[in-house]
């Protein structure tokens, strides 16, 4: 894997905005399994029945409000040709869900019609059965889709299903491959080594982690090759829900010379996660500061706030509170005509720990 990024992103990311998780649906018959736009995306050939309780529209078919996802036609053809057999029927996309068992308290009572299997096996699998990731087959049976046991994946907690949208329980996978093929592919990733051989858990099945990870490797064809199972056309798409959005990721055709990367979490990937975390932290700190410290920062000098937070982070203040205190102290010093550089040097002589320095700076400048 080269150290530099390529100049092209090899992912299409389709977003469905303003997702409204389902409620108990007492006013709909039959109840929906997913909001209509998501249902039409994940089950494109699966008709959504009209609401029989809506007498004005009970004979109307559902229509998506969002544009269709952008799909690389060559990739689509690759998958279709790979899974087409001698029969006249075309292969259909299957929907799988990777469940984070750590987020549900009732795993031992869960009994599903579809296949369900922990990505951890053997003694380790037994020891981690309550916290492991599980691959689940989401059955394409009409009764199951609308009233079945996986009900709740797109619902509010108040709907009182086993599953819910709000807890980010896992990720969706679109694939033409059978359960065992997808399962064996995914088993490669929950535990990875870094470049120094240290093992750690890689929670790619957490929607937030997958969202960040795909952004990190979007320009790394070798990483995408391995993660999607490109040679064998295993993963057609990843899907995930975050907040009020649903993301659907498909792969573009990769350069012919692309080889799959080793299954290692490289330093640049780890740095990518750190960068994403910092950007989110900075955004939160900016919003908080503008609200709580209007005497120091406003929309007019928001750029200075961003610079000062970034400066504090790069100076190693590390903790959120110490980065915030650094930005507050610097702006207060500027407003009061105090030489902040000299003040910081003076404080650093007696306070080597970043948190102690930040507290002392705020104390000297009377910031609470």
Annotate each predicted stretch with a short phrase.
Residues 2-29:
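Short, mixed-charge low-complexity intrinsically disordered segments
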Residues 28-130, 135-145, 149-158, 162-368:
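A contiguous, surface-oriented mixed alpha/beta subdomain in the mid-to-C-terminal portion of proteins
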Residues 1-2, 206:
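Short, well-ordered amphipathic alpha-helical segments that serve as non-catalytic structural scaffolds
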């Amino acid at each position: 894997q080269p150290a530099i990024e390529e100049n092209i992103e090899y992912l299409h990311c389709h977003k469905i905005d303003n997702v409204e998780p389902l409620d108990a649906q007492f006013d709909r018959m039959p109840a929906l399994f997913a909001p209509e736009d998501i249902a039409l995306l994940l089950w494109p050939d699966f008709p959504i029945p009209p609401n029989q309780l809506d007498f004005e529209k009970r004979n109307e078919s559902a229509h998506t409000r969002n544009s269709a996802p952008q799909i690389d036609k060559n990739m689509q053809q690759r998958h279709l040709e790979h899974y087409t057999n001698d029969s006249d029927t075309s292969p259909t996309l299957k929907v799988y869900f990777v469940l984070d068992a750590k987020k549900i308290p009732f795993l031992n009572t869960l009994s599903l019609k579809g296949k369900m299997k922990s990505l951890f096996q053997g003694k380790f699998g037994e020891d981690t059965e309550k916290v492991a990731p599980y691959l689940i087959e989401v059955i394409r049976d009409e009764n199951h889709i609308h009233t079945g046991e996986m009900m709740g994946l797109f619902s509010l907690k108040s709907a009182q299903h086993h599953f819910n949208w709000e807890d980010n329980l896992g990720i969706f996978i679109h694939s033409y491959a059978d359960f065992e093929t997808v399962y064996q592919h995914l088993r490669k990733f929950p535990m990875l080594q870094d470049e120094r051989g240290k093992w750690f858990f890689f929670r790619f099945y957490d929607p937030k982690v997958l969202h960040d990870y795909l952004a990190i490797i979007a320009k790394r064809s070798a990483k995408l090759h391995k993660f999607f199972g490109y040679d064998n056309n295993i993963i057609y798409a990843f899907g995930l829900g975050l907040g009020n959005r649903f993301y659907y990721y498909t792969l573009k055709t990769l350069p012919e010379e692309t080889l799959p990367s080793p299954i290692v979490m490289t330093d640049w990937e780890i740095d990518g996660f750190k960068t994403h975390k910092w950007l989110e932290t900075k955004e939160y700190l900016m919003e908080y500061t503008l609200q709580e410290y209007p005497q120091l920062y406003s929309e007019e000098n928001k750029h200075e706030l961003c610079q000062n937070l970034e400066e504090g982070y790069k100076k190693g203040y590390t903790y959120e509170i110490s980065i915030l205190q650094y930005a507050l102290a610097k702006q207060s010093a500027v407003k009061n005509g105090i030489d902040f550089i000299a003040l910081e040097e003076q404080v650093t002589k007696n306070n080597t720990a970043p948190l102690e320095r930040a507290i002392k700076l705020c104390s000297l400048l009377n910031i609470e």
